[in-house]
Amino acid sequence: MTVYADNAATTRMSRTALDAMLPAMEENYGNPSSLHSVGQRAAELLMKSRETVARCLNCQPREIIFTSGGSEADNQALLSAAAIGRRKGKMHIISTAFEHHAILHTLKKLEKEGFQVELLPVHENGMVSARQVAGAIREDTCLVTVMFANNEIGSILPIEEIGAVCREKGILFHTDAVQAAGHLPIDVQAQHIDMLSLSGHKFHGPKGVGALYVRGGIPLVNVIEGGAQERGKRAGTENVPGIAGMAAALEDACAHMEENRVKVTALRDRLIQGLSKIPHSAVNGDLEHRLPGNVSFCFEGIEGESLLLLLDAAGICASSGSACTSGSLDPSHVLLAIGRPHEVAHGSLRLSLCEWNTQEEVDHILREVPRVVEYLRSMSPVWKDLESGKKAFML
């Protein structure tokens, strides 16, 4: 049996997405900027896809910019907000300590350009409050960027409350919704969101395509220079097949969101309950405000990479954190942000489920993870020191 439990890293593309993409490659293959009929058919498909994404977010189609993915959308949002702030003499940006690296690395770049970046501390349950955001706002704050839901530990942030604070203060609010889109209700109007990033491959769409929502009237900085595509805000011939697939996948995910949430949450909770029985283990993230498919644990006395390799040999595909940092010897910055010690953070496991996972697959995980953890601990000198009392248990 092979169990794919790494859906936070990427998802298998749905038949709905594939069926939307094939006509764009076989029939409507023209350049949407061309004036002839084949090009105009592609342009029409592009327009319909934009309308679909806009409906799912409750915004206007003209407020959607198609990108190559979430990272590009994040970069364009932050650089655009920074440019607005620089013109107004406002050089203070608020974010959190456990954002995706697409946000954190861009903020580092802006720091080198003279911006002051304030990273709010994260509570041990993986939450940041609207009160924290309100308390950090200054006269020279130009942007607040807070992720909708964390990719590693699954905590869902109070986006509507944070958005309301920013709207009241007249400060731009961006959210990285890459993990939330297609899984959680998003309404950019009700949630007071000015800019939002999403990525198609997180909800059974294709890789290499994403979108940036930008509230009307907010000027954008071009990250890619060239032609006049995307209203002159994102150069390069649009990836029409990818965009069509992403739009179809998002529409399908939103249509079945509640039934998927109920099914996946039940699988998640069963996994959390079963894995919690392993001695000296701990769940990461908030148990109530949590992505439906996210299961994140730390196991004391083991190393996460060894755990992943042995689980893979047992047919279980998982991760020890973000796939974007796979292979790094450093512990997860997310786990460190919620207060996990280095030695504990190294023994992390993330299982991320979707509606295609089954009870039988959960049974397999619940058999194999305890077995592998016990096996690794039996060989670990760190575990022996913990058992002998030379070192104190932390979990």
Regions found by a protein language model. Give the residues of each.
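Pyridoxal 5′-phosphate
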Residues: 1-395
